[in-house]
Amino acid sequence: MGVGELRMCSERLSMMGTLSSEFKSCLQAVTEQPRIYADANVAAGLVAFMRDRLRWDVLFVIEHDDLRRASDQEHNRVARRLLRTLITFDRDFLENKRFRPSKNGGVVVMSVPDQRTRRRLLQSLDRNIFGGPVQHERRKALATSTIPLEGRKIDVHPGWDEQ
């Protein structure tokens, strides 16, 4: 193999990504919707709101027998592996020792008492974090990052978006 052939081979290899990077680029082409992992303590009605009203791509653990009784650590790992932002009401996910930000794909912890406020705050999250339907170009740009909140945690409560 000559120098020219080695250079061409090297250029081809540098153009190819890892399986993970190739998967991410395919995923970006398929969906611009926020990819959500809703754990077991998120109400089915709220999941329906995320899917129907906000048009989010939501994996709801209650609908999957193998995930329904998984530990919090397993939910965190699976959400990241599936390139999804985890949404929960479990405040344990805010503990940085147990759930290091560098080891998550983004976590949204909600602490909201009533359904109406939860929906309003999810709409705010859609607008301010995921780009929302009004900001279609921003949503497309965020889709290229695949997990917009990767390595971050947000404690969503009344007034969180006014700070």
Label the predicted regions.
Residues 54-60:
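A generic structural motif
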Residues 79-98:
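Acidic, metal-binding active-site segment of PIN/NYN-like and related structure-specific nucleases
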Residues 62-68:
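Short beta->alpha junction loops
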Residues 20-30, 34, 39-40, 44, ...:
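Acidic, PIN/NYN-like endoribonuclease modules and their adjacent C-terminal/linker elements
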Residues 17:
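Divalent-cation
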